[in-house]
Amino acid sequence: SGRGVRIKTDSPFVTHCKSKQGELLACELPGREARRTEPRFTNLPTAAEALFKVIAPLLLEDTETPYVLIGHSVGSWLLFELLKLIVSGGVPEPAQLVISSFPAPSLPTSERPWRAQRQLGEAAFKDECRRWDSNELIFQDSLWEHYGPLMRDDFTLFDEYVYEPPQAPFKMPIQAYVAQRDQKVTEKHLRNWAGLTSAHFSLESVPGHHLFFYDYPVRNEWMDNVIAALPENCR
């Protein structure tokens, strides 16, 4: 979760799942791609509840097969909220949580490395988007009419987010990744995820900027790394 990336050729994730007779389930939030006409979420817990309603029956149907949750950018916070619902709902927990390019949700609001979009005029908001390494094409007038409101809503997801800690630290290991040229999120921000689990925490770096998913060689290198770091029962 976190990016609406459409992959037209087999990625390392797809190849790995095929070789293990596993499944790869991608989350596409309302307001994007095939769901672009649906109202967008502006509240992460609400989005997590909607995702939980979809995924919980699948996990309860097969309680023996291990699974991993993977989230990029604000998708990491979406998975944090989803995990709280999984734990409290008695649903089988993931064998591992993989997150990239976003601070731990426990980071105090005053230390978040961005400016709240509601305080920004259009020019300042575009500048903020550029600092997240957004593609310059979206700032063309004909495209900004669509992407401007979409990104305002996306920013609201993390601007207005209020952290509520889980009842206890999670029990699964957390594998984290920081992009080497990310203008916003640093290694220090990622290390704070360690406090959310009682299990092992690992942090590695990947080449590229915040949206390294759009650099296919880097994305595939990252995917290979994720696969190599999977728990034994998921390899």
Regions found by a protein language model. Give the residues of each.
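Alpha/beta hydrolase fold serine-hydrolase catalytic domain that processes acyl esters and thioesters
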Residues: 7, 56-60, 84-235
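A conserved amphipathic alpha-helix that caps or lines the catalytic cleft of carbohydrate-
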Residues: 14, 79, 83-86
